[in-house]
Amino acid sequence: MKFKTGDKVRVMRGKDAGKEGQITKVLKDADKVVVEGINMIKKHQKPNNANPQGGIIDKEAPIHVSNVMLLDPDTNKPTRIGSEVKDGNKVRIAKKSGTAIDK
């Protein structure tokens, strides 16, 4: 998985295509990511200590990694992700501009 928590991504397919957000959670086993404010669903919540009223809450649902692309830190356009070894460390790079994503 080439995505990490905190990466800025753009949704390329689906009902939220074109929207941008930050990754809040990475689900490696399912190849999915949770993006802040994207792919919102309504969940019926039973009453509990945290929410004694219960009811319907809005929540972000995971989206498959094939439907999102990382935003290039320089150009702010969608780009693919590559990797290079610099100073003995593996670093993610943006394919379009060649700049390092991990600082």
UniProtKB/Swiss-Prot annotation:
GO terms for molecular function: rRNA binding; structural constituent of ribosome. Keywords: Ribonucleoprotein, Ribosomal protein, RNA-binding, rRNA-binding. Belongs to the universal ribosomal protein uL24 family. Gene3D superfamilies: 2.30.30.30. It comes from Lacticaseibacillus paracasei (strain ATCC 334 / BCRC 17002 / CCUG 31169 / CIP 107868 / KCTC 3260 / NRRL B-441). The gene is rplX. One of its GO terms (biological process) is translation. HAMAP family: Ribosomal_uL24_B (MF_01326_B). SUPFAM superfamilies: Translation proteins SH3-like domain. GO terms for cellular component: ribonucleoprotein complex; ribosome. One of two assembly initiator proteins, it binds directly to the 5'-end of the 23S rRNA, where it nucleates assembly of the 50S subunit. One of the proteins that surrounds the polypeptide exit tunnel on the outside of the subunit. It comes from the Bacteria. Part of the 50S ribosomal subunit. This is Large ribosomal subunit protein uL24.
